[in-house]
Design a protein with these regions (language model features):
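Long, small/polar-residue-biased beta-strand-and-loop interaction regions
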Residues: 1-178
């Protein structure tokens, strides 16, 4: 007598390792504008949120000693006017890279063809631009992530100068929404 026996079976096993945690970072950027300045140094002493609907920045006329004047700004060839200083702060836990673009112009936008803008970031001069050339006045600026209670920030100064070659066709014109 012959006896044959077989067993047919599938064996499975699982091995796994748990990943502790995957968590995304938080990007938290604030944009503020200067509202008050030290009368001796001219440095900003107070800031307001620039992202609020009622926050509209206006160019500021300064005298020869860089003192701010409250008069209306009427552009004329050769004159330079400044925006209030802007402060970009990184309150998040991710590093940040940003640029500042001049855009949104409405009205007689050809007026921007004869205004050259320039900027500085923390005192370092950036490239001067004309809006018709693309409008990115500040590019590739980096801010580290917030560490403890200290939020890294940059102070940006932007000015515009009307070209001395601007002719009569630019008189009594308005551009808004920049």
């Amino acid at each position: 007598t012959m006896l044959v026996g077989t067993t047919f079976a599938w064996f499975t096993d699982t091995a796994s390792a748990k990943v502790n945690q995957i968590k995304s970072g938080k990007l938290d950027v604030t944009l503020e504008y200067a509202t008050a300045w030290d009368t001796t140094t001219g440095e900003p002493t107070a800031w307001a949120d620039a992202t609020q609907p009622e926050s509209m920045l206006s160019f500021i006329r300064t005298d020869a000693n860089n003192n701010k004047q409250a008069t209306d700004v009427l552009w004329e060839p050769g004159c330079t006017y400044n925006l209030p200083e802007l402060r970009v702060s990184n309150n998040g836990n991710l590093s940040l890279k940003y640029k500042v673009v001049i855009s949104g112009a409405e009205g007689y936008t050809k007026l921007l063809d004869v205004i050259d803008f320039k900027a500085s970031v923390d005192g370092a001069e950036q490239r001067a631009v004309n809006v018709k050339d693309g409008g990115a006045i500040v590019t590739d600026v980096k801010l580290a992530a917030k560490s403890g209670d200290n939020a890294p920030s940059n102070v940006i100064k932007i000015s515009g100068t009307m070209q001395t070659t601007a002719g009569n066709e630019y008189q009594n014109r308005t551009v808004t929404g920049i």
